[in-house]
C-alpha cells in the first residue's frame, strides 16, 4: 500500500496504542461509521500494513531481568556464513531482535535473560558454539529509558 490518507494513519495510530479497540470505538475516534472503518482496517491487513495483532508482555513479570545488546563480528562476511548465522539465532527464544549491520560489527542482537548466570549459559551453550564468529561484545542495559513498538504514522 503506497499511500495512506489521514484516516488510515489515525486508524494505525489508534490500533498501535490499543489493538483490542472495538470497531465501534475505532470508527467513533476516526469519524467514520463502522462499515467503512472495518473496510479500511481489512484493507490495511490485506495489504500487509497491519501485519499482526499481539499482546505486549512485561519482560520483568516473566522473570527476564537482564537485557543485553550483543555485537557480533563474523570471521568472514560471505553469504553462506551470514545465512548460517541468521538461521541459527532465529531458533533461539532469548534473541528478540537481530540486525545485519554496517560498520565495525556484522550483527547486533537484543537478548533477554533471567539473570547473569542465565546469560552466561546462553553465551557458552549457544552463541560461542556457532562456527565462524570472530568476536562477541556484550553490553548490558542498566535501565530502559524508552520502549515503544508503535511506529510514527
Question: Could you say what each language-model-derived stretch is?
Answer:
Residues 1-153:
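A compositional/biophysical signature of low hydrophobicity enriched in polar/charged and small residues
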Amino acid at each position: 500500500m503506497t499511500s495512506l490518507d489521514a484516516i488510515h494513519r489515525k486508524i494505525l495510530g489508534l490500533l498501535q496504542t490499543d489493538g483490542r479497540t472495538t470497531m465501534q470505538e475505532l470508527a467513533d475516534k476516526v469519524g467514520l461509521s463502522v462499515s467503512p472503518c472495518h473496510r479500511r482496517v481489512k484493507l490495511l491487513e490485506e495489504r500487509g500494513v497491519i501485519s499482526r495483532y499481539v499482546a505486549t508482555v512485561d519482560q520483568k513479570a516473566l522473570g527476564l531481568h537482564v537485557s543485553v545488546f550483543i555485537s557480533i563480528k563474523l570471521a568472514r562476511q560471505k553469504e553462506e556464513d551470514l545465512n548460517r548465522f541468521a538461521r541459527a539465532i532465529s531458533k533461539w527464544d532469548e534473541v528478540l531482535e537481530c540486525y545485519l549491520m554496517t560498520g565495525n560489527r556484522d550483527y547486533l542482537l537484543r537478548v533477554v535473560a533471567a539473570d547473569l548466570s542465565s546469560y552466561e549459559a546462553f553465551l557458552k551453550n549457544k552463541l560461542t558454539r556457532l562456527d565462524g564468529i570472530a568476536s562477541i561484545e556484550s553490553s548490558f542495559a542498566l535501565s530502559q529509558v524508552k520502549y515503544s513498538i508503535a511506529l510514527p504514522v
